[in-house]
Structure formats: structure tokens, C-alpha cells
């Protein structure tokens, strides 16, 4: 028998389809679907967002990439749809705040700029809101019912991952999780360049992959947060 929690989750997922319309695989534009499933207080997520994800914009890869962020991570959902976050209540609040920000801006550059601001200093998130130019819209969403609906939508997306995520940050390219060969930002850049099938001219960085591989690179040593594991705060 399907649990009441799952039934309710499916209902909310259907209810929010218009809000979260997004194909996991490459669309007609040929853009690479880059999805990041994360939680706001996961150390590895913070490092990846601040230090690595920015290269998508530094290298103009956003022109061939459809970047989507899903701030739910390893949170748990009870039968009455209560959300319990891995790193405590503060993480739930920041996840909801970031969900509202993602809703507020239509373009991925503005979305990333705000998320990066928060993840760079999670205790100073209020200044990110005040300096965003969208303070009222974000606060109205965060303080109203919409933030909860958005989080439930992200819960649906995260829980329906196939294969299921094992930890966060969890990154997928065109619906498939990164394999073990991707161990640095350069590796991720190369994967994006190779996955692009559209007609837009490739960013210069895609034509310099050979020289990139010869230069020293920072191997990822991310402090990931595993699913179904308790975290001591």
C-alpha cells in the first residue's frame, strides 16, 4: 500500500508542475541540463557553489547550459509533510529562502549570484536579501505559503531522482549523475563541452580543453553529506 506521505507528495508534485516545468534531459535547444541537488548548510555544497559552479559563468558556459538548483538535499518529509533538514532548522529556513530567490529571478545568472552570496556567508544572508534589489518579492515569498509549496516541489524532484541521490552535492548532466571520472572543475567543464549538441558557438574554454588539462588543477575534496545519515550539530 502506498504511504500517505508518498500520496501527498505526488499530489503536491502534480499541483506544482507549472511552477517547476523542467526537462531533465537535453531540450530542443541542445543546451546541457546541469542540475545541482544540494542543501544550504552542507559544507561540500557551499564549497561547490562558491568555488566551482561560478566557472559556468566565468567561462561563458551558461550560454550552452541550462542550470537548475534544487535546495532540498537530504531533508526528510514526514507523513504530514513536515520537513526535517539534515543540518537543523536553520538549514530549512535557508533552503526556503533560496527557493524563493530561485522563483524570484527568471535568469540563471541572477539566481546564481544570490545563491552564491548566501552560501559564501550563511550567517550574513540578510545582507544578500537587502542588496538583491528584490527584497520585497523574496520576503513576501519566504513569509507566505509559497515558500513551503516551493520546498515541497523540490522535495518531489529530489525524491524522484533515478538513480536516487547518495549524497549532496549531487550533480547531474542531462539527467545522469556525474561519474567517478569527474574529479575537478576542469573535468566538469570538459563534460559540459562534450555534452552540448546545439548550434550556438561553443565558448572559448571548450576549445582550450587540451591546454586546461596540462595546467595544475584543484582536485575536488568536497565534504559531502550522505543521505540517510544523522549529522551532529
UniProtKB/Swiss-Prot annotation:
Main subcellular location: secreted
Record propeptide residues: 200-233
Residues in coiled coil: none
Signal peptide: 1-26
Record GO terms (molecular function): oxidoreductase activity, acting on a sulfur group of donors, disulfide as acceptor
Tissue: Expressed in the outer integument of seed coat.
Glycosylation sites: 80, 207
Subcellular location, record wording: Secreted; Lysosome
Disulphide bonds in the chain: 42-45
GO cellular component, one term: extracellular region
Keywords in alphabetical order: Disulfide bond, Glycoprotein, Lysosome, Secreted, Signal
A Pfam family annotated for this UniProt entry: GILT
InterPro entries, per database record: Interferon-induced_GILT
Family note: Belongs to the GILT family.
Assembly behavior: Dimer; disulfide-linked.
Functional description taken from the UniProt entry: Lysosomal thiol reductase that can reduce protein disulfide bonds. May facilitate the complete unfolding of proteins destined for lysosomal degradation.
Protein name, entry field: Gamma-interferon-responsive lysosomal thiol protein
The organism's taxonomic lineage, starting at the top: Eukaryota, Viridiplantae, Streptophyta, Embryophyta, Tracheophyta
